[in-house]
Amino acid sequence: MNACILLTTLVTMITIEKVQGQSYHFSNGWNPGKRSMQEPVCHFRQDVQTLVLKLIEDEVYRMLSDPSCIGGVPTLRNFLKKDLAYTVPLDDKK
Protein backbone atom coordinates (compact mmCIF):
# COMPACT_ATOMS: atom_id res chain seq x y z
CA MET A 1 0.00 0.00 0.00
CA ASN A 2 2.78 2.43 0.92
CA ALA A 3 4.61 1.61 -2.32
CA CYS A 4 1.47 2.47 -4.32
CA ILE A 5 1.13 5.84 -2.58
CA LEU A 6 4.83 6.55 -3.06
CA LEU A 7 4.66 5.65 -6.76
CA THR A 8 1.54 7.80 -7.30
CA THR A 9 3.19 10.75 -5.54
CA LEU A 10 6.35 10.34 -7.60
CA VAL A 11 4.46 10.20 -10.92
CA THR A 12 2.40 13.25 -9.92
CA MET A 13 5.51 15.24 -8.99
CA ILE A 14 7.24 14.36 -12.27
CA THR A 15 4.15 15.32 -14.28
CA ILE A 16 3.80 18.65 -12.46
CA GLU A 17 7.49 19.41 -13.01
CA LYS A 18 7.23 18.73 -16.76
CA VAL A 19 4.01 20.68 -17.31
CA GLN A 20 4.78 23.62 -15.03
CA GLY A 21 6.76 25.57 -17.67
CA GLN A 22 4.23 24.96 -20.44
CA SER A 23 0.91 26.45 -21.42
CA TYR A 24 -2.07 24.90 -23.16
CA HIS A 25 -4.03 26.43 -26.01
CA PHE A 26 -6.99 24.56 -27.48
CA SER A 27 -5.83 25.00 -31.10
CA ASN A 28 -2.10 24.31 -30.60
CA GLY A 29 -1.90 21.98 -27.61
CA TRP A 30 0.97 22.11 -25.12
CA ASN A 31 3.72 24.60 -25.87
CA PRO A 32 6.80 25.74 -23.98
CA GLY A 33 6.01 29.24 -22.76
CA LYS A 34 2.90 31.30 -23.39
CA ARG A 35 2.83 31.43 -27.19
CA SER A 36 4.09 29.17 -29.91
CA MET A 37 5.91 30.26 -33.03
CA GLN A 38 5.62 28.47 -36.35
CA GLU A 39 9.29 29.01 -37.31
CA PRO A 40 12.25 28.10 -35.14
CA VAL A 41 13.55 30.97 -33.05
CA CYS A 42 17.25 30.24 -33.51
CA HIS A 43 18.54 29.10 -36.88
CA PHE A 44 21.35 29.82 -39.33
CA ARG A 45 20.51 31.73 -42.46
CA GLN A 46 21.37 29.69 -45.55
CA ASP A 47 23.77 32.30 -46.96
CA VAL A 48 25.69 32.50 -43.66
CA GLN A 49 25.93 28.73 -43.43
CA THR A 50 27.21 28.55 -47.02
CA LEU A 51 29.86 31.20 -46.36
CA VAL A 52 31.08 29.48 -43.19
CA LEU A 53 31.35 26.10 -44.91
CA LYS A 54 33.17 27.73 -47.85
CA LEU A 55 35.67 29.33 -45.45
CA ILE A 56 36.26 25.99 -43.73
CA GLU A 57 36.80 24.18 -47.03
CA ASP A 58 39.20 26.87 -48.26
CA GLU A 59 41.20 26.65 -45.04
CA VAL A 60 41.35 22.85 -45.29
CA TYR A 61 42.56 23.16 -48.88
CA ARG A 62 45.25 25.59 -47.75
CA MET A 63 46.35 23.20 -45.01
CA LEU A 64 46.46 20.26 -47.41
CA SER A 65 48.62 22.17 -49.86
CA ASP A 66 50.97 23.49 -47.14
CA PRO A 67 53.69 20.93 -46.22
CA SER A 68 54.09 22.38 -42.72
CA CYS A 69 50.45 21.56 -41.80
CA ILE A 70 50.54 17.80 -42.43
CA GLY A 71 49.95 16.96 -38.73
CA GLY A 72 46.47 18.49 -38.64
CA VAL A 73 45.07 16.96 -41.82
CA PRO A 74 43.77 13.56 -40.50
CA THR A 75 41.73 15.32 -37.80
CA LEU A 76 40.16 17.62 -40.37
CA ARG A 77 39.37 14.70 -42.66
CA ASN A 78 37.54 12.95 -39.85
CA PHE A 79 35.73 16.19 -38.95
CA LEU A 80 34.40 16.85 -42.44
CA LYS A 81 33.79 13.14 -43.23
CA LYS A 82 34.68 13.35 -46.88
CA ASP A 83 37.72 12.98 -49.08
CA LEU A 84 39.62 16.24 -48.96
CA ALA A 85 42.29 15.38 -51.51
CA TYR A 86 41.62 18.54 -53.52
CA THR A 87 43.68 18.97 -56.64
CA VAL A 88 42.26 22.38 -57.60
CA PRO A 89 40.86 25.25 -55.51
CA LEU A 90 37.15 25.06 -54.75
CA ASP A 91 36.35 28.11 -56.91
CA ASP A 92 37.80 26.36 -59.98
CA LYS A 93 35.64 23.25 -59.47
CA LYS A 94 32.36 25.04 -60.26
From Swiss-Prot:
Protein's UniProt keywords contain Transmembrane: no
Site positions per UniProt: Cleavage: 34-35
Annotated GO biological process: neuropeptide signaling pathway
Signal peptide: 1-21
Record key words, sorted: Cleavage on pair of basic residues, Neuropeptide, Secreted, Signal
MF-aspect GO terms: hormone activity
One cellular component term from this protein's GO annotations in UniProt: extracellular region
Subcellular location: Secreted
Function field: Neuropeptide involved in reproduction. May be an important hormone in the regulation of gonadal maturation.
Protein's UniProt name: Prepro-gonadotropin-releasing hormone-like protein
Originating organism: Ruditapes philippinarum (Japanese carpet shell)
